[in-house]
């Protein structure tokens, strides 16, 4: 565990999130949402640009974080996978799953899989996508029940819990960094919108 913690902490503390890349990728995902072949082609071309920027400026977006964690884990002889899926936030994937918009990692430590998100651990965005660097350990080897409230994988196996239903948390309330920092798994309400009736 400590070997992986060293990799993860180094990445989170030395790489910054790039809002420009994020906005470009989000725009192109929307543009090609009905043409997966064109999206894959564009994505493969964009990867070269993204990795050059990662090396030169130590800035990237979620895919770069996930790729770097995976590659460094490989060099340390640790089994690690990139998980693609949906991140829930105030402006994405609230009542229904739209376009996949995020990548994170699953790592096998001592024959057990764990989930982590170096992008969200490294800091957060404010106002006009200004990145604030603030390390949050809560996304490191996170509780799968809590993780599923904001991270919904394309492949169900990466929920890491057979009792979780892939789309159940789409209508649930949002959870943010402080929830993860304190490993506090909210049990209710089940829905983000609660209907209130007068005189009933």
What do the PLM-derived regions correspond to, one by one?
Residues 1-58:
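Secondary-structure boundary elements
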Residues 9-10, 16, 91-92, 96-99, ...:
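Domain-wide signal for the mature, well-folded portions of proteins, strongly enriched
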Residues 40-44, 63-70, 166-168:
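A broad, low-specificity signal for short, low-complexity segments enriched in glycine/proline
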Residues 63-146:
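Hydrophobic/aromatic-rich core segments of domains that either
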Residues 124-200:
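Alpha-helical and coiled-coil interaction segments, frequently adjacent to or embedded
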């Amino acid at each position: 565990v400590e070997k992986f913690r060293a990799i993860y902490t180094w990445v989170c503390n030395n790489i910054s999130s790039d809002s420009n890349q994020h906005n470009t990728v989000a725009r192109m995902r929307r543009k090609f949402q009905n043409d997966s072949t064109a999206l894959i082609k564009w994505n493969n071309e964009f990867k070269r640009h993204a990795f050059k920027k990662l090396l030169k400026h130590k800035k990237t977006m979620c895919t770069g974080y996930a790729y770097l964690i995976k590659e460094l884990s490989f060099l340390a002889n640790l089994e690690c996978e990139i998980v693609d899926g949906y991140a829930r936030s105030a402006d994405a994937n609230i009542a229904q799953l739209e376009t996949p918009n995020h990548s994170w990692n699953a790592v096998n430590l001592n024959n057990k899989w764990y989930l982590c998100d170096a992008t969200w651990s490294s800091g957060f965005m404010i106002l006009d996508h200004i990145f604030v660097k603030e390390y949050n350990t809560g996304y490191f080897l996170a509780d799968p029940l809590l993780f599923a409230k904001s991270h919904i994988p394309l492949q169900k196996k990466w929920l890491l819990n057979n009792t979780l239903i892939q789309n159940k948390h789409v209508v649930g309330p949002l959870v943010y960094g402080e929830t993860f920092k304190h490993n506090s798994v909210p049990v209710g309400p089940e829905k983000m919108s609660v209907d209130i009736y007068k005189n009933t």
